[in-house]
Amino acid sequence: MSVPTTQKAVIFETNGGKLEYKDIPVPKPKANELLINVKYSGVCHTDLHAWKGDWPLATKLPLVGGHEGAGVVVALGENVKGWKVGDYAGVKWLNGSCLNCEYCQSGAEPNCAEADLSGYTHDGSFQQYATADAVQAARIPAGTDLANVAPILCAGVTVYKALKTAELEAGQWVAISGAAGGLGSLAVQYAKAMGYRVLAIDGGEDKGEFVKSLGAETFIDFTKEKDVVEAVKKATNGGPHGVINVSVSERAIGQSTEYVRTLGKVVLVGLPAGAKISTPVFDAVIKTIQIKGSYVGNRKDTAEAVDFFTRGLIKCPIKIVGLSELPEVYKLMEEGKILGRYVLDNDK
């Protein structure tokens, strides 16, 4: 398969600096890597943080962001096995890990101290050709709609892992805070597919209609409710058994520790810059609640999340725009005006 020497990409030289849509060299895969012709790439809040540089983890510079890339393998490093040119593959957040530490050996590769992160420490999917470690690259079944599967590679895997972390049983209530966004809209669907009752929390009537169309049983509009905590408790007859916090609101996270049911689990996913969680110790002990962080999933979680999608149980509410329009997508993201997930067509 013919591979060009240059490609279109969006790159920045400094954190918060100009996002340049321009020609850059096509990378050459290392011995353990795939070269993937990225057809589509989802846009995640993490990409916005990587550009701004407002997380306590330094990015490489200059940097090509993006970590939800779906495409076709066009070249293989000499040590790669189990892949062939023409396979569908995904660039996900975890680009590679050491595979030798205690975390990698126990299936917690995302927690590896030497983890290489797409669109953060490794040039990501906001380019037409990207490299990915052959062990960690996502396997996508042939014939899959690449535009629609792209958000599954991070957003889908992330919320699916969070729901597993909540350790709920079928028929129990789960509250999803930030339910209409890119992560939340997928969390609602995965929760429904896993047999849970879904209470969605977000702001605006249009968002209520949207999340109910995805499977939410109840919607709480935080812009209209005077007491969100009591409203959630009332709607779920005592509070949800689990909460998935994909919201980037520190206040919403705090409220979740108040309305979660006794013996319930609060799972933290969204990463508001500089945020802290605060809850009365007395209440946490008496209610015996658990507060858990949930990062991205491992290879098994990825395969399972993709399987839900390929079986038609998850629909990605996406809007496709050109790669060159990434700065406008970031602006909408900062203004909180995004329903579902924006996906970039890397050929535009």
From Swiss-Prot:
Q: Chief localization class? A: cytoplasm
Q: Which UniProt keywords apply?
A: Cytoplasm, Metal-binding, NAD, Oxidoreductase, Zinc
**CDD domains hit by this protein:** CAD3 (cd08297)
> What Gene3D superfamilies does the database record attribute to this sequence?
Medium-chain alcohol dehydrogenases, catalytic domain, NAD(P)-binding Rossmann-like Domain
Q: In which residues is NAD(+) bound?
A: G178, A179, A180, G181, G182, L183, G184, D202, K207, V269, G270, L271, R341
| Enzyme Commission no | 1.1.1.1
Residues binding Zn(2+) 1, per UniProt: C44, H67, C154
- Annotated Gene Ontology MF terms? alcohol dehydrogenase (NAD+) activity; zinc ion binding
Which Pfam family is one of this chain's hits? ADH_N
This protein's record includes keyword Calcium: no
Q: Which cofactor does it need?
A: Zn(2+)
Query: What superkingdom heads the lineage?
Result: Eukaryota
Q: Entry's SUPFAM superfamilies?
A: GroES-like, NAD(P)-binding Rossmann-fold domains
Which compartments does it reside in?
Cytoplasm
Asked if Signal is a keyword of the record, the answer is no
Q: GO cellular component terms? A: cytoplasm; fungal biofilm matrix
Record InterPro entries: ADH-like_C, ADH-like_N, ADH_Zn_CS, GroES-like_sf, NAD(P)-bd_dom_sf, PKS_ER
Listed binding positions for Zn(2+) 2 are C98, C101, C104, C112
- Cofactor binding: number and manner: Binds 2 Zn(2+) ions per subunit.
Q: Which reaction does it catalyse?
A: a primary alcohol + NAD(+) = an aldehyde + NADH + H(+); a secondary alcohol + NAD(+) = a ketone + NADH + H(+)
Q: Which residues form a coiled coil?
A: none
Subunit-level organization = Homotetramer.
Indicate the family of this protein.
Belongs to the zinc-containing alcohol dehydrogenase family.
UniProt protein name: Alcohol dehydrogenase 2
